[in-house]
Amino acid sequence: MRGLKDELLKAIWHAFTALDLDRSGKVSKSQLKVLSHNLCTVLKVPHDPVALEEHFRDDDEGPVSNQGYMPYLNKFILEKVQDNFDKIEFNRMCWTLCVKKNLTKSPLLITEDDAFKVWVIFNFLSEDKYPLIIVPEEIEYLLKKLTEAMGGGWQQEQFEHYKINFDDNKDGLSAWELIELIGNGQFSKGMDRQTVSMAINEVFNELILDVLKQGYMMKKGHKRKNWTERWFVLKPNIISYYVSEDLKDKKGDILLDENCCVESLPDKDGKKCLFLIKCFDKTFEISASDKKKKQEWIQAIYSTIHLLKLGSPPPHKEARQRRKELRRKLLAEQEELERQMKELQAANENKQQELESVRKKLEEAASRAADEEKKRLQTQVELQTRFSTELEREKLIRQQMEEQVAQKSSELEQYLQRVRELEDMYLKLQEALEDERQARQDEETVRKLQARLLEEESSKRAELEKWHLEQQQAIQTTEAEKQELEQQRVMKEQALQEAMAQLEQLELERKQALEQYEGVKKKLEMATHMTKSWKDKVAHHEGLIRLIEPGSKNPHLITNWGPAAFTQAELEEREKSWKEKKTTE
């Protein structure tokens, strides 16, 4: 029903715009009443004038409306429409309202009835947006159909030339421009009026009336069994047959559904090109004029039944939908391409601006580089002049330095020789100091041993004195104890003798230790003498060493051999170092 409402709206739009004289989008209420009444009549919808008054009650003066006619049209008319009205009568009513205002006054090669059919075809092929137009692709499709119906050859180059001259500001033609295009004979040159009219009628029957095929054939009666010629018209779900092609006297219908079938029959009873249409309750036997017509009708009926089984629309409507979908897809792709082109153009403009900015920066940089190059050349000349002067001065200084180096090399060699001698003396002094340190250690060891022996000797002497006192006390004891004490005295005498022997031994060891101490003391004196001798030699040779260094205005120390090679601070530092070493040893 949605597709039916869209098709009805196109014709109603023409009628409404024809009533809108000042093109304000509004029509007076009285005109809308007439339009609504006529629509309800031709569409076989109950008319309710009270609903119209109620819908527009807020604006009783002048043109309507604040709420608009479209909501009323949808609610009270289009939603109630059933597919039981006469489409030709409906289109004729809308055509009558708009034709006088819009149809060109120029003479046309087609009749007004043909113009009406072109107008209906326009509504079928136009885009689903308002104001209604037919795009060049659909114009080409329609003109091809008309040319084929007229039996002529399609001139593609002529149509391409027409498209080139097409107004770029327009996306397509209006209904009245299409009527004028077909009516002026631009694409039907050499064809008479009758041929053009027949072609328009044939295309109208196919696209609007859904006539898939039509023509004369013989039909066998069900009661009398006689054969009668009839004009057959095949539509998507019915085959109607008439007395003649003027369609005035209809004799019957063959209702088609998915259960019907068509079969070819062999020739019989003098009838040729026979085929059979089997329906639910009846079977129709038909004879075509020749084998070609028979095959065409069988194929057409079979295709129609197949479409009914699939639930598909008629071929021309399905083809129209495919073309629209293809155009939508192409339009979407074109819009996407235009969007990408705009993005690329914007990016290109940004790049151009960036390049222009870079060019300006490069020019500025080139200008600065030229100035800097000029300054650099000037500076280079100055530097070369200065360098030449400096080079000459450096050569002179280098020559003087070479002479000084030669002189200093000789002095350095002497200095190095003295340093080597001093190093040897330092090594010998270190050995002497080591001997002195070892002698001191030996002396300390002997001294500790002698002290230990003296301590043991005093301990023994104290013990002997104690024993002597005890012996004296024992002598003074009673006679009863004398014998026992005598025995103890004898034992103690023996112990005393042993202690005396140990004491003598300790005395001997003390004497030996004293002799060792005297020997070590002599060694220490000799080591001290040697250390003093080496120190004197080192001091003597250090006085001979003088570092090669630039002259100084500070006062020098004077030695027996001339100016000293060290300062007063260095001398004090060395004396401090020697004193610390001596204290440590």
Swiss-Prot record:
Gene3D superfamilies: Pleckstrin-homology domain (PH domain)/Phosphotyrosine-binding domain (PTB) (2.30.29.30)
Record's subcellular location: Cytoplasm; Cell membrane; Nucleus; Cell projection, Lamellipodium
Coiled-coil annotated spans: 316-529
One Pfam family this sequence matches: PH
Post-translational modification: Tyrosine-phosphorylated.
BP-aspect Gene Ontology terms: actin filament bundle assembly; isotype switching; negative regulation of actin filament depolymerization; negative regulation of cell-cell adhesion mediated by integrin; positive regulation of actin filament bundle assembly; positive regulation of cytosolic calcium ion concentration; positive regulation of mast cell chemotaxis; regulation of actin polymerization or depolymerization
GO cellular component, one term: nucleus
InterPro entries per record: EF-hand-dom_pair, PH-like_dom_sf, PH_domain
Keywords tagged on the record: Cell membrane, Cell projection, Coiled coil, Cytoplasm, Cytoskeleton, DNA-binding, Membrane, Nucleus, Phosphoprotein
Domain PH per the UniProt entry, residue ranges: 210-306
GO MF assignments: ATP binding; DNA binding
Gene that this sequence comes from: Swap70
UniProt entry tagged with the keyword ATP-binding: no
Comp. bias intervals (Basic and acidic residues): 351-373
Free-text note regarding domains: The PH domain is essential for phosphatidylinositol 3,4,5-trisphosphate binding.
SMART domains with a match to the protein in the record: PH
Main location as per UniProt: cytoplasm
The protein's assembly and partners: The SWAP complex consists of NPM1, NCL, PARP1 and SWAP70.
Domain of life: Eukaryota
Keyword Oxidoreductase belongs to the record: no
Protein name: Switch-associated protein 70
